[in-house]
């Protein structure tokens, strides 16, 4: 669990602002008085806002509260989607069929919700014709325009030119 709460005897403050299990404020009480009220109700005294003046404590069933918190965190983790970046490597002199195969792979990755990094590696003197690589990447981004947006425009990195495509949000 990401946040552990201070409970019962572990609370250091002399007086606390007390809230009962229904959310009603019982006012400012001494720590001892608050512990007695919690004990009478067979519940725990939990410090929920330690930085307030005076600190805020709530009377609740700590075991049940912790279980609920863990359940909420688990649900939040389930809803988080891990975004992977898949790479598609191209060359500036790519043939039509090879381009279509790479395009099909890129579209498949985008439809699954992954980002796609399209990389063109320039070999030898091909680096002098960057505009050819630029055209290949532009063609790829135009072919995926219906399901993706360009996150990073084509740019050079050493002998490589790359472009990052992200899936459009209205897909999911």
Swiss-Prot record:
Primary subcellular site in the record, as a coarse category: cytoplasm
Keywords: Cytoplasm, Initiation factor, Protein biosynthesis
One Pfam family, short name: IF3_N
GO CC annotation: cytosol; membrane
Keyword Lyase: no
Annotated GO MF terms: ribosome binding; translation initiation factor activity
Superkingdom of the source species: Bacteria
Compartments where found: Cytoplasm
Keyword Lipid biosynthesis assigned: no
Single biological process term from Gene Ontology: ribosome disassembly
Family: Belongs to the IF-3 family.
HAMAP family reported for this sequence: IF_3 (MF_00080)
Record's subunit section: Monomer.
NCBIfam families documented for this protein: infC
Protein name: Translation initiation factor IF-3
